[in-house]
Amino acid sequence: MRVLVAMSGGVDSSVAAARMVDAGHDVVGVHLALSATPGTLRTGSRGCCSKEDAGDARRVADVLDIPFYVWDFADRFKEDVIDDFVASYERGETPNPCVRCNEKIKFSALAGRALALGFDALATGHYARLSDGRLRRAVDADKDQSYVLAVLTAQQLRHAVFPIGDTPKAQIRAEAAERGLAVADKPDSHDICFIPSGDTRAFLGARIGVRRGAVVDAGGTKLAEHEGVHGFTIGQRKGLGIAGPGPDGQPRYVTGIDAATGTVRVGGAEDLDVSRLTGERPVFTSGAAFGGPVECQVQVRAHGGLADAVASHDAGVLSVELRAPLRGVAAGQTMVIYRPDPEGDEVLASATISGAAGR
């Protein structure tokens, strides 16, 4: 099989490439250049493509004796990931850019080019498993990345390979060291790759500018003025611009964002509890949509826990009734539906959260 391996320059994709070589495949490595100014991207095995990362990937390819290329996807990345990220915050949402990158860049633009060039599959260093075309959680639950892959269609998954999903991260590092790969101890990066400072509010403010609005309590009383809804997310406690706790002495959190009026609503922790979710743009990873109701578990954050729920689908809307309330769920987040399975929880579907209500 002719396999293109996406090599970030980190330990995970490096071992993935090595395993593809060991399996006897015709392997080519590719590193994605995602910025016109590479120094602005964070480095690390979860980072995206600084000059240092490209050099690390090339050195691994040399050790493995495989062809290696750097492909420029900067324009596509800006349009489909960065611009989308900014626009989502302008709408008062909280997006996950890693989900978008997998959907639009790695497994659409990159995979599409790979297939056009005659490759049979795209391999990556994601922690996830595929069995009989079904996407499952990785063996290493702490590193599992099935959540950020749940936007992939059955067609995309048919050409995907995840060589390290059956191995714990510690073992991957040990294997890299045994193979003599210099990236064996390279640290992971857990922040947004195109915001190296980690200051999301400043990044958004520089692109959106000042759009003043009011911070109000549950009764609509104005408490403060802000410089844009893009500086807030549901569940946020710090940086609200208000003095002290609420009248009950308890902390106040962002409980609602109305981008149309520029209003940010705050309330108590209990006001963050939701028991019903709705999602747009559903994707069914096996290719078959379910109607409902389906007993399942739902995850609403990349590193969040699983919550028992019942899911149903009708007219392009994915609806979830939670068995117990979840706290601080924001529009724009991805919700992923899992079917519990002793062989590895199976991803059934995903959708972009458009509504959260009830307690």
Curated annotation (Swiss-Prot):
GO annotations of cellular component type: cytoplasm
Residues reported to bind ATP: 6-13, 32, 125
Subcellular location: Cytoplasm
Superkingdom of origin organism: Bacteria
UniProt catalytic activity: S-sulfanyl-L-cysteinyl-[protein] + uridine(34) in tRNA + AH2 + ATP = 2-thiouridine(34) in tRNA + L-cysteinyl-[protein] + A + AMP + diphosphate + H(+)
GO biological process: tRNA wobble position uridine thiolation
Active-site positions on this chain: 101 (nucleophile), 193 (cysteine persulfide intermediate)
Disulfide bridge partners, by residue number: 101-193
Pfam families in alphabetical order: tRNA_Me_trans, tRNA_Me_trans_C, tRNA_Me_trans_M
CDD domains linked: MnmA_TRMU-like
Keyword presence, RNA-binding: yes
Record-marked site positions (Interaction with tRNA): 126, 333
Annotated EC: 2.8.1.13
Region of interest (Interaction with tRNA), residue spans: 143-145
GO MF assignments: ATP binding; tRNA binding; tRNA-uridine 2-sulfurtransferase activity
Keywords linked to the UniProt accession: ATP-binding, Cytoplasm, Disulfide bond, Nucleotide-binding, RNA-binding, Transferase, tRNA processing, tRNA-binding
SUPFAM superfamilies the record matches: Adenine nucleotide alpha hydrolases-like
Record keyword Disulfide bond present: yes
Record HAMAP family: tRNA_thiouridyl_MnmA
Family of the protein in this entry: Belongs to the MnmA/TRMU family.
Function in brief: Catalyzes the 2-thiolation of uridine at the wobble position (U34) of tRNA, leading to the formation of s(2)U34.
PANTHER family: MITOCHONDRIAL TRNA-SPECIFIC 2-THIOURIDYLASE 1 (PTHR11933:SF5), TRNA 5-METHYLAMINOMETHYL-2-THIOURIDYLATE -METHYLTRANSFERASE (PTHR11933)
Protein's recorded name: tRNA-specific 2-thiouridylase MnmA
Lineage: Bacteria, Bacillati, Actinomycetota, Actinomycetes, Mycobacteriales
